[in-house]
Amino acid sequence: KKILEKIKKRYEEIIDGLDLNLNLDHEFDKIEENFLAKAGRDYAASRGEYLNGLVMAEYLGYEFIDPAEVIFFDEHGVFEPETTNKELAERLEHVERAVIPGFYGSKHDGSVKTFSRGGSDVTGSIVAKAVHADIYENWTDVSGFLVTDPRIVKDPEVISTITYRELRELSYMGATVLHEGSIFPLRQEGIPIHVLNTNAPQDPGTMIVENTCSKPKSTTFPPAQTAFKI
């Protein structure tokens, strides 16, 4: 309870600083009640994202949509793309702007289920597919994909354009800019991805598309591997 009070106070400071007409007392009461009822680790992990979404929606004047109401997993925790896409498309059909927090949804029993680390990328791609977006902008903390590992080569160039297939190969080699689970929903619909840097919005980033005719773009070197020619 003391920890929740500290968190609540911090949110109140943020709300006051933004001069918002938002009261989260009821939300914190629900969170405490669910914690006492042993709601689980995924529920706890998702509450910051949920509360941030409420604040952001109020600040922007957009509708807030709880992912637990529109993103679904089965009883084994496996994501259900068809059910989710149908529900999301119907929910967003008449919504011009909305804030949808990332990385979690719910199982059939109502319990919260999270995606793996980086799951907000997946949430964004799911929403982009549901609304048939022209492009999916993924804002992160880097300026796109690099031509090689910066731990090996100093100041490598950023790849301006890359294909879905090339991206998948890079992910197998350890590239972690984008959650690999975010690729499939967008590739199905032919929606390009633009990876951009939140901390450097002027940077052009990397565009991910279905096809490109440009030359090879990157060099990878998996550690602890040896090749023999016989």
Name what the model sees in each region.
Residues 1-178, 183:
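Nucleotide/pyrophosphate-binding catalytic subdomain
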Residues 34, 151, 190, 209-210:
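Short amphipathic alpha-helical patches
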Residues 146, 195-213:
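Terminal amphipathic helices with adjacent charged low-complexity linkers/tails
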Residues 179, 190-197:
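Acidic/polar loop patches that form or flank catalytic/metal-binding clefts of enzymes
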Residues 186:
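Acidic-aromatic/histidine active-site loop/patch
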Residues 206-230:
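A conserved regulatory-domain signal marking ACT and ACT-like small-molecule sensing domains
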